[in-house]
Amino acid sequence: AVKLQPNGGSVQTVTAPTTPKTVYVNMTTDCLYAKPGETVTPSVAYDGGWMHAYTYIDYNNDGKFTPKVNDNLSIEAGSDLVSFSFYGGNDNENGKNSAGTSISGSGRNTLVMPAFTIPADTKPGMYRMRYKVDWNSIDPAGSIDQSNPIIGNGGGIIAVMLNIHGAYANVND
């Protein structure tokens, strides 16, 4: 299951089927909701060990997720990667989460992703959103490292839709 919780709001959940076990699950018929400028916290439910969680939003609706991370492991402006629990560039080294908190040792075994803010200038509309569980990889398609590929490490990807809407909506009959 993947979740999104607006700051002070109710948790929204999309539950993916557990069988058959696949790396990619298309749940784009399910939708989560957020407003421009709203702070939200993503989360995943995962049974397994020593993995990390990543969330992406295709803000420019170009059909691909483009992660951009600075040398200090902070998320670059304009990145489709919006939150991650751990990234270190090297499997055996310390790293950070997307809030910039340094993580080392057994603390690297975390799926807890920091909250992020939907940019205030985001136009209302439908956006593809991707949740990924993987080991130390910001690649939105999953690690292809021969020593620990997503297909072999027990990770997975769930795709959903994100409905960005204003505080009010007009309903037409």
Give the role of each language-model region.
Residues 1-173:
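A broad "non-catalytic interaction surface" signal
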